[in-house]
Amino acid sequence: MAPKAEKKPASKAPAEKKPAAKKTATSGTKKRSKTRKETYSSYIYKVLKQTHPDTGISQKAMSIMNSFVNDIFERIAGEASKLAAYNKKSTISAREIQTAVRLILPGELAKHAVSEGTRAVTKYSSAAN
């Protein structure tokens, strides 16, 4: 039987950090790109310019609007999902979305949202043909 090599106990001192080598674009290594954050900012800005062409929006206000759109989207999607489950359907259709909007948004706001949504779906359907 061959003798076993002795193992040195691990030193408790952290390993010395070497300065990172500078990488250039010509070295062939890919630079890590930033992860893309999806927001509704461009769409919010377009709607703002349609309604108030001479008005701007701050970054903080845009962030608030983006959070608002995400919140409403999640509420409607959640309610539509429940409605589909109640009716034993695995697909959320325009009908579930419309009913969810009526349940979530109050009074006149729901009526306007439903009419605008119907108009958008009609426009999309006619463009698809």
Curated annotation (Swiss-Prot):
Q: Give the modified residues of type Phosphoserine.
A: 11
Which parts of the sequence are annotated with region: Disordered? 1-38
> Which InterPro entries does the entry link to?
Histone-fold (IPR009072), Histone_H2A/H2B/H3 (IPR007125), Histone_H2B (IPR000558), HISTONE_H2B_site (IPR055333)
Give the keywords, sorted: Acetylation, Chromosome, DNA-binding, Isopeptide bond, Nucleosome core, Nucleus, Phosphoprotein, Ubl conjugation
Q: Where is this cross-link: Glycyl lysine isopeptide (Lys-Gly) (interchain with G-Cter in ubiquitin)?
A: 123
What GO terms fall under cellular component here?
nucleosome; nucleus
| Sites bearing N6-acetyllysine, chain numbering | 7-8, 12, 17
| GO-annotated molecular function | DNA binding; protein heterodimerization activity; structural constituent of chromatin
Q: Describe its partners and assembly state.
A: The nucleosome is a histone octamer containing two molecules each of H2A, H2B, H3 and H4 assembled in one H3-H4 heterotetramer and two H2A-H2B heterodimers. The octamer wraps approximately 147 bp of DNA.
UniProt-recorded name of the protein? Histone H2B.2
The gene is: HTB2
